[in-house]
Amino acid sequence: MVCLKLPGGSCMTALTVTLMVLSSPLALSGDTRPRFLWQPKRECHFFNGTERVRFLDRYFYNQEESVRFDSDVGEFRAVTELGRPDAEYWNSQKDILEQARAAVDTYCRHNYGVVESFTVQRRVQPKVTVYPSKTQPLQHHNLLVCSVSGFYPGSIEVRWFLNGQEEKAGMVSTGLIQNGDWTFQTLVMLETVPRSGEVYTCQVEHPSVTSPLTVEWRARSESAQSKMLSGVGGFVLGLLFLGAGLFIYFRNQKGHSGLQPTGFLS
């Protein structure tokens, strides 16, 4: 069984553990006696995978940090006077100090190996769509929206091109938005005045794909759009008539095949 470890060797299902210690047992509603909070927080900072790892073991009292262990320092240090006795005591205990120093490997690198396959190595390809924010005639100010959604990890590069040339002015981005399901989304907008015949391209680079994703938006005049819609409508109408004709033909054929010559015994 593979499990996440806490400093000290015990297996847990969380990387960060919060321990709350109250001054008395849970009180009934209406009890106004003071409460006191003691909270340890353990952090692993990874640089270039596990090439360099920094471990922090931090302790808070009433939301104020009092003492910490930093693997880059190698011992406990008091952050406030309240934490000085703890720092001095833990540094005097050889087993506690050795355990904290070893946590870079026994805690951080161990847990990195457990979760790496579904966190660091996880890849989800983005979905890209392009559309104008407003429906209006050409040669009017508009905002072209490149919607990039459902991707992981969050490192992504979105660029706009006009007729093959990169556009850097007039770009507005929402930044990364977390979807709450381990995926991200972002909107990158381009302020422009579209003219007939222009081709706008949104290009997306992401670790989940080997080559950039591109989606085009072509500026068309109202007459060109109406011609295109008429063509599509005529094509769909033709398919409907073709389907109806084939249906009638095969139905008639089936009816004729069921007739038998007079006097024929089967």
Swiss-Prot record:
Amino acids binding a peptide antigen: D86, W90, H110, N111, R122
Record annotation: effect of changing L187R: Decreases the interaction with CD4
Mutagenesis or variant effect for Q99R: In allele DRB1*09:01, allele DRB1*10:01, allele DRB1*14:01, allele DRB1*14:05 and allele DRB1*14:07
Result, substituting H45Y: In allele DRB1*08:01, allele DRB1*08:02, allele DRB1*08:03, allele DRB1*08:04, allele DRB1*12:01 and allele DRB1*12:02
Extracellular side: 30-227
Annotated effect of mutating Y107V: In allele DRB1*07:01 and allele DRB1*09:01; requires 2 nucleotide substitutions
Effect ascribed to mutating I96F: In allele DRB1*08:01, allele DRB1*08:02, allele DRB1*08:04, allele DRB1*09:01, allele DRB1*11:01, allele DRB1*11:04, allele DRB1*11:06, allele DRB1*11:11, allele DRB1*12:02, allele DRB1*13:05, allele DRB1*13:07 and allele DRB1*16:01
Residues with glycosylation annotation: N48
Effect of H141Y: In allele DRB1*14:01
PTM remark: Ubiquitinated by MARCHF1 and MARCHF8 at Lys-254 leading to sorting into the endosome system and down-regulation of MHCII.
Regions of this protein lying in the Cytoplasmic compartment: 249-266
Effect of A102G: In allele DRB1*03:01, allele DRB1*03:02 and allele DRB1*07:01
Residue location of crosslink Glycyl lysine isopeptide (Lys-Gly) (interchain with G-Cter in ubiquitin): K254
Gene3D superfamilies in alphabetical order: Class II Histocompatibility Antigen, M Beta Chain, Chain B, domain 1, Immunoglobulins
Mutagenesis / variant outcome for changing A103L: In allele DRB1*08:01, allele DRB1*08:02, allele DRB1*08:03, allele DRB1*08:04 and allele DRB1*14:03; requires 2 nucleotide substitutions
Self-association state and partner proteins as the record states: Heterotrimer that consists of an alpha chain HLA-DRA, a beta chain HLA-DRB1 and a peptide (peptide-MHCII). Newly synthesized alpha and beta chains forms a heterodimer (MHCII) that associates with the CD74/invariant chain (Ii) in the endoplasmic reticulum (ER). Ii is a trimer composed of three subunits and each subunit interacts with one MHCII dimer, blocking the peptide-binding cleft. As a result, MHCII molecules cannot bind peptides present in the ER.
Designated name of the protein: HLA class II histocompatibility antigen, DRB1 beta chain
Annotated organism of origin: Homo sapiens (Human)
